[in-house]
Amino acid sequence: IGGINCAKKAPLPADLQEFVDGSGDAGFIVFTLGSMVSTMPAEKAKQFFDAFRQIPQRVLWRYTGELPDDLPKNIKVMKWLPQNDLLAHPKIKVFMTHGGTHGIYEGICNGVPMLMFPLFGDQGDNVHRLVARGVAEKLSMLDVTTETLLAALKKIINDKSYKERMETLSSIHLDRPLQPLELATFWTEFVM
């Protein structure tokens, strides 16, 4: 049931809270490609590191690959992220994701525009739907460059319509007579 994973939000660990609170007006970006993809070829990772070093936003990246010797100070790399808790923070600007169902519902629930990199399965369809609604942009992991990544991030951050449309989509999604867990319970009991 869409959004069942959105209800509970926990306080961030102290180091993450300090990192995101210290992002100032520029805010921060969350980047994760889901639980199945936590690394990428070094050449591709370099393009992401090069792009991130050029933006004022801080970046929280779920990544287990090799780090550059000159890791930019605006990037915090972690093996695991409390994704929903971070997406609920008021300074979040963009959610960079592969477009898995779990993650997109967390992004929608929290009203966060997305930059999406579909990799397999239903992700392509999920991404297509959000791009069509004007709340996300799509890049191909195979073709992305430092320049295309920078352009997409700047577009989403600077064009306020992405955030406005996502907040509208979020309010529609959250406006329901039963919360997702209540709905699941109702239908489970109904069929029994």
Predicted regions and their residues:
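Catalytic core of nucleotide-sugar-dependent glycosyltransferases
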Residues: 1-192
